[in-house]
A protein has these predicted regions:
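Transmembrane-helix signature of 12-pass secondary carriers
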Residues: 1-174
Length: 174
């Protein structure tokens, strides 16, 4: 049973990674980018409240789907939004945050689980739902991908997104 709890998350990640980019090309990168973290946060909360192995496994699968779909979409957005000279550095920085997340998760497990009684694992998982707040506060303000908008014939919105990044970067409009 323990191996399933870990393995099912990787199954979800594989599926999410396989379909995340496809869905983002259809409905928008920003939509999927925001949805993946919301899915992750809600599923983490569901895992913390699970009352059966089946519910725990289902929530873990959904967490994997969210994380897996995040991978291609986040990398694509960072690549599209980064200046050419900084694109490689920005992508590496993005990917390094996975390691930061693992370290934070390990620290939460180390400090929270043994110090909060029988419900320690639930508290640790509930803390994992906090990225949901991050998604609500920050990701909803990220503009849609310029390439996606252009591909959908939404040139005015694409131009607005370009202006947003020019202003943020201190670049004068062309």
């Amino acid at each position: 049973e323990k191996s399933w709890v870990l393995s099912i998350g990787f199954v979800g990640m594989a599926i999410g990674a396989a379909v995340g980019g496809f869905i983002a090309d259809r409905v928008g990168r920003k939509t999927v980018f925001t949805a993946t973290l919301i899915i992750f946060g809600i599923a983490n909360g569901a895992m913390a409240l699970s009352w059966s192995l089946g519910m725990l496994l289902g929530a873990r699968l959904i967490i994997g789907l969210g994380l897996g779909a995040e991978l291609p979409v986040a990398s694509t957005l960072v690549s599209e939004f980064s200046p050419t000279k900084q694109r490689g550095r920005m992508t590496v920085l993005l990917e390094s945050f996975w390691a930061v997340g693992w370290i934070v998760a390990a620290m939460i497990g180390y400090f929270v689980i043994p110090n909060t009684g029988d419900w320690g694992w639930r508290w640790a998982l509930a803390i994992g739902a906090l990225p949901l707040l991050y998604a609500i506060v920050t990701r909803v303000h990220i503009p849609e991908s310029v390439r996606f908008l252009e591909a959908k014939g939404r040139e005015d919105e694409a131009e607005k997104a370009v202006r947003y990044f020019e202003e943020a970067g201190g670049v004068a409009p062309v």
